[in-house]
Amino acid sequence: MAGNSFGTLFRFTTFGESHGPAIGCIVDGVPPRLPLDEAFIQGFLDRRRPGQSRFVTQRQEPDAVRILSGVFEGLTTGTPVMLEIVNQDQRSRDYGEIRDRFRPGHADWTYQAKYGIRDHRGGGRSSARETASRVAAGAVARRVLETAPAPVTVRGALVQVGPHRVDRARWDWAEVERNPFFCPDAGTAALWADYLDGVRKAGSSIGAVVEVVASGVPAGWGEPIYDKLDGDLARAMMTINAVKGVEIGAGFAAAELSGEENADEMRAGPDGQPLFLSNRAGGILGGISTGQDIVVRFAVKPTSSILTPRRTIDTAGHETEIVTKGRHDPCVGIRAVPVGEAMMACVLADHFLRHRALVGAPGPVGNGGPVEDGDPVGG
């Protein structure tokens, strides 16, 4: 199967299925002599781990990572880093009824159409279980970013669940780690809890929007035309399971703005570098970073596995009905937050190495950081 690798210089390949023995990744292009151990990677995996609240799948996986290669005495060696996560809580019996039936909204039919065979247990390779491997790769990417000329911070938050959006006037990054939703607003988190309890008890699911922000990225990362930084970020987010839309900066809202409103004006900063008065561009112009915060949002569709009976067909082409059993996320967007962070880190690590290889030194540091406190996009 093609399409299992991502990146150019910093490149990772993931492997494994939802109910297979293990999942993991091989990360290539990691510079030597970077500190890396399992405890560092585990910290990021624990944020994504299932079973931590009633609002996510109750599959109990410790997601304990093992470093199998590429590290010696706590430092990377410059050779491929292989990371393994053993699956420990598969319940394949829950999926016996779908061996010969295609679940609406899942990749069952498309995998069968392409390969003539599919692993029906938990979705196999198409399961969101694969994203744990990306989070592990993202941890390695963060070590690469630590060698950049200035600190690069990648943070994510859930900003919408169903019709309910966060109150950006109350945005607090510290609040993200205090609730089970990665929500930057305590009031909205409480509302989401009540809302999702109703969704969960009904056996249904709901979509969400995730926002990922990178601060401290110097001006100059990215390439023009076909290798744009925002192009790679959009592709990265679209590879995440259940993601159906991506926007950068003002994104689709830019269609409603005038040219005067949309273009980010500049003043001269004390260091002679531009000081942007807004960040509608989301930190990228012409495919190259501006030095401002890079702001990406992506929409996650509702989990397709629900208890409501749905019409479908079986492998013989007969119409039938299906109710999906198993342990599923009522809102898969919650655990997509650490995954989005990981993909942002991987793209930035790749472009950092590419920029350094091309010009020999990083670009100048711009005026990064939020334009207004609590609002990464600004206005």
Curated annotation (Swiss-Prot):
Cofactor: FMNH2
UniProtKB keywords: Amino-acid biosynthesis, Aromatic amino acid biosynthesis, FAD, Flavoprotein, FMN, Lyase, NADP
Keyword Metal-binding: no
Family annotation (CDD domains): Chorismate_synthase
A single cellular component GO annotation: cytosol
Keyword Amino-acid biosynthesis (UniProt): yes
Catalytic activity: 5-O-(1-carboxyvinyl)-3-phosphoshikimate = chorismate + phosphate
Pathway where it operates: Metabolic intermediate biosynthesis; chorismate biosynthesis; chorismate from D-erythrose 4-phosphate and phosphoenolpyruvate: step 7/7
MF terms in GO: chorismate synthase activity; FMN binding
Sites where the protein binds FMN: 125-127, 241-242, 286, 301-305, 327
Binding residue positions for NADP(+): 48, 54
One of the GO BP terms on file: aromatic amino acid family biosynthetic process
Documented EC number(s): 4.2.3.5
InterPro entries for this protein: Chorismate_synth, Chorismate_synth_AroC_sf, Chorismate_synthase_CS
A Pfam match: Chorismate_synt
Cofactor: how bound: Reduced FMN (FMNH(2)).
Signal peptide: none
Function summary: This reaction introduces a second double bond into the aromatic ring system.
Subunit organization: Homotetramer.
Family: Belongs to the chorismate synthase family.
Name used for this protein in its record: Chorismate synthase
The species this protein was found in: Rhodospirillum centenum (strain ATCC 51521 / SW)
